[in-house]
Amino acid sequence: MASMIRKSLDDPEESRPVAQGMGQVDLVNLEAGPVGRATFLPGWKWSDHVKPIAKTDSCMASHTGYTISGRIKVVMDDGEELEFGPGDFGVIPPGHDAWVLGDEPYVYIDWQGMADYAKPKE
């Protein structure tokens, strides 16, 4: 019989800050892969605060997740745009930029795209 597992993003196994103190990603690891909680502050923009870490022109992570609070705008490399807010579930393919809208931090749970997100390239 399989055992239950309990982990908390309030006690993460790993935390990764983004540039200029504009947020962080907290991670717990499960058999299916890492689950992350991203918290980005007002003024955060992927191309300003994660691009220097990722060293790619746009975010190349696939994201599958749920917005807890705040708002974010995502623009794909091909120009497609979407905004996400509290209660929204989303799937975002690789090749995008994103930024926080408004004056509230953006908090997002992601169970697909966090394995290498905001992880310095060696």
Residue ranges and their predicted role:
Residues 31-36, 42, 63, 68-70, ...:
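A generic structural signal for short beta-strands and their flanking turns/coil linkers
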Residues 76-95:
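Short acidic-glycine-tyrosine-enriched beta hairpin
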Residues 37-58:
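Conserved short histidine dyad/triad with adjacent acidic residue
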Residues 45-46, 70-75, 98:
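Short beta-strand segments in beta-sandwich/barrel cores
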Residues 1-39, 47:
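A short, N-terminal "cap"/entry segment at the start of jelly-roll beta-barrel domains
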Residues 36, 80-82, 107:
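Short beta-strand segments
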Residues 2-11, 99-122:
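Double-stranded beta-helix
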Residues 52-78:
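Glycine- and acidic-residue-biased ligand/ion/polar-headgroup-sensing regions
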